[in-house]
Amino acid sequence: MIMPQTRLDVADNSGARELMCIRVLNSGIGGKGLTKGGGGNKRYAHVGDIIVASVKDAAPRGAVKAGDVVKAVVVRTSHAIKRADGSTIRFDKNAAVIINNQGEPRGTRVFGPVARELRDRRFMKIVSLAPEVL
């Protein structure tokens, strides 16, 4: 579960290394880019949810700089995800992929496994870039 002030690793090559969640937004992609409706009153973000985050640590000469405010989709959480078949999956660390306003990743690679729930939320580009989908 990700809430404001939570720090996340970045799972892409956009140049950022660490993010801090500022706000939990909607969940998923609509017909034309991100769904409208603002943030609502969600307290926690789970896998596949979109957050607004601040870049806390960045690599030099990257696409994003430290201090930038970006949108990101959560791809891994250390809190267990319960699935419809009764199984659960959890990851070692929280991680996110930085996206643009159309919901496409800003980086060209995704590092580490991602959860299968991203496919249900229509983040197909992230799923196709990931080396493993669990």
UniProtKB/Swiss-Prot annotation:
GO biological process, one term: translation
PROSITE patterns: RIBOSOMAL_L14
Cystine residue pairs: none
Domain of life, per lineage: Bacteria
SMART domains per UniProt: Ribosomal_L14
Record-linked CDD domains: Ribosomal_uL14
Keywords attached to this entry: Ribonucleoprotein, Ribosomal protein, RNA-binding, rRNA-binding
Gene Ontology cellular component terms for the protein in this record: cytosolic large ribosomal subunit
Keyword Cell wall biogenesis/degradation: no
Similarity field: Belongs to the universal ribosomal protein uL14 family.
Function of the protein: Binds to 23S rRNA. Forms part of two intersubunit bridges in the 70S ribosome.
Name this protein carries in UniProt: Large ribosomal subunit protein uL14
Gene that specifies this protein: rplN
